[in-house]
């Protein structure tokens, strides 16, 4: 008996503890349910109030407009004519600057919303056709003339001479004030360009330099330099060693 009583006491204690825990859980769960019920009730009340105010405003908006309805007929007709001008006059233009309305001060002229430059863009963008637009201008700065006065010769010679040709001419001897003489082929080639004066200067300076180099170091007899008159390369050192 003693062993049975010892086992009953712990079992009873466990049952008591379980009952206390269950009662506490029940008490704790009841306030949460009450709070949720209260919140739901408050929400339902608010929704009912909003629906009531909405129906009330709708009823206010839906009230009839006071006043006679006979005066509204001409204004409606004017509005229809304003938005649909073809109802009264089928021959009228579709686009108008001012609506007809009461027909006071109507404007029937149509203004194109797109500027005329848009249509004429291709015509304005094309340059005027000119056959000689891509050709070179043959500007003749100086020409050799035999019937010129002394003042004209000095002026033309100043244009045709350069600093290099002037210094070389002082070394070799006096030169004429006219433009340097050239062959007809050279004149034709130089007249095709605008810088014909600079071409003449370069050719004359090249001739003078060739003459000075030939005088300083004469080559052997019958050399191609003497035949051409304008050597491309002059080997002065080699000619001096051979002599």
Swiss-Prot record:
InterPro entries: LAT2. The chain crosses the membrane at residues 6-26. Highly expressed in spleen, peripheral blood lymphocytes, and germinal centers of lymph nodes. Also expressed in placenta, lung, pancreas and small intestine. Present in B-cells, NK cells and monocytes. Absent from T-cells (at protein level). The keyword Membrane applies. Changing residue 136 to F: Slightly reduces phosphorylation upon BCR activation. Phosphorylated on tyrosines following cross-linking of BCR in B-cells, FCGR1 in myeloid cells, or FCER1 in mast cells; which induces the recruitment of GRB2. One of its GO terms (cellular component) is extracellular exosome. Keywords: Adaptive immunity, Cell membrane, Immunity, Lipoprotein, Mast cell degranulation, Membrane, Palmitate, Phosphoprotein, Signal-anchor, Transmembrane, Transmembrane helix, Ubl conjugation, Williams-Beuren syndrome. Residues 27-243 are cytoplasmic. Residues 174-243 are annotated as: Disordered. Changing residue 84 to F: No change in phosphorylation upon BCR activation. It is linked to LAT2 is located in the Williams-Beuren syndrome (WBS) critical region. WBS results from a hemizygous deletion of several genes on chromosome 7q11.23, thought to arise as a consequence of unequal crossing over between highly homologous low-copy repeat sequences flanking the deleted region. Haploinsufficiency of LAT2 may be the cause of certain cardiovascular and musculo-skeletal abnormalities observed in the disease. Involved in FCER1 (high affinity immunoglobulin epsilon receptor)-mediated signaling in mast cells. May also be involved in BCR (B-cell antigen receptor)-mediated signaling in B-cells and FCGR1 (high affinity immunoglobulin gamma Fc receptor I)-mediated signaling in myeloid cells. Couples activation of these receptors and their associated kinases with distal intracellular events through the recruitment of GRB2. When phosphorylated, interacts with GRB2. May also interact with SOS1, GAB1 and CBL. This is Linker for activation of T-cells family member 2. The gene is LAT2.
């Amino acid at each position: 008996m003693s062993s049975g009583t010892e086992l009953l006491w712990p079992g009873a204690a466990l049952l008591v503890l379980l009952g206390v825990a269950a009662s506490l859980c029940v008490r704790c769960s009841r306030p949460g349910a009450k709070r949720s019920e209260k919140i739901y009730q408050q929400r339902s009340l608010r929704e009912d109030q909003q629906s009531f105010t909405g129906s009330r405003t709708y009823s206010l908006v839906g009230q009839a407009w006071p006043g006679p309805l006979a005066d509204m007929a001409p204004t409606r007709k004017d509005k229809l004519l304003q938005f649909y001008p073809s109802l009264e006059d089928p021959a009228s233009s579709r686009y108008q600057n001012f609506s007809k309305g009461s027909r006071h001060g109507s404007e029937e002229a149509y203004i194109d919303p797109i500027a005329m430059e848009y249509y004429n863009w291709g015509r304005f963008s094309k340059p005027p056709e000119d056959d000689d637009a891509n050709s070179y201008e043959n500007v003749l700065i100086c020409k050799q003339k035999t019937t010129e006065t002394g003042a004209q010769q000095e002026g033309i010679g100043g244009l045709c001479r350069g600093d290099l040709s002037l210094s070389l001419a002082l070394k070799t001897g006096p030169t004429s004030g006219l433009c340097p003489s050239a062959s007809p082929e050279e004149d034709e080639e130089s007249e095709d360009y605008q810088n014909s004066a600079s071409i003449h200067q370069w050719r004359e300076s090249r001739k003078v330099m060739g003459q000075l180099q030939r005088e300083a170091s004469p080559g052997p007899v019958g050399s191609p330099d003497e035949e051409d008159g304008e050597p491309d390369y002059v080997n002065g050192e080699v000619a001096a060693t051979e002599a």
